[in-house]
Every structure is written in structure tokens, then in C-alpha cells.
Amino acid sequence: MEKSQSSCDTRKRSVVVDVDNTKDRISDLPNRILGKIIVKLPLDEAVRIMALSKRWKSIWDDN
């Protein structure tokens, strides 16, 4: 039983490592594409995103 518990722990750790190594693909998108995304969001969602990111706020101001 300890053996299976140990293998579960190993799998959990490897998943965490994989999550940490994932690339943020949204940041790679050009501003014109991000502008098309942000105008389709509900206003409350757009406001939350703009509060978190200067780039998104700039894109919102341009649209």
C-alpha cells in the first residue's frame, strides 16, 4: 500500500512541475488580437483584467 501511495505522490509532483513549465500563450498574442478579445468580455471581467495588467489597460484605451 505504501508503494502505491508513493507513486501517487510522485505523479502529483510531476504534474506540478509540468504546470510551472507551461508557457503563457496569451502574452504572445499581438495587441490587435488582444483588443478583439477584450471588447468581447463582459465589462466587469474587462475591468478586473485591466486592474491586473498595464498592457491590457493600454489595449482597452486604444479600443
UniProtKB/Swiss-Prot annotation:
<dbReference type="InterPro" id="IPR001810">
    <property type="entry name" value="F-box_dom"/>
</dbReference>
<dbReference type="Pfam" id="PF00646">
    <property type="entry name" value="F-box"/>
</dbReference>
<dbReference type="InterPro" id="IPR036047">
    <property type="entry name" value="F-box-like_dom_sf"/>
</dbReference>
<feature type="domain" description="F-box">
    <location>
        <begin position="23"/>
        <end position="63"/>
    </location>
</feature>
<protein>
    <recommendedName>
        <fullName>Putative F-box protein At1g47702</fullName>
    </recommendedName>
</protein>
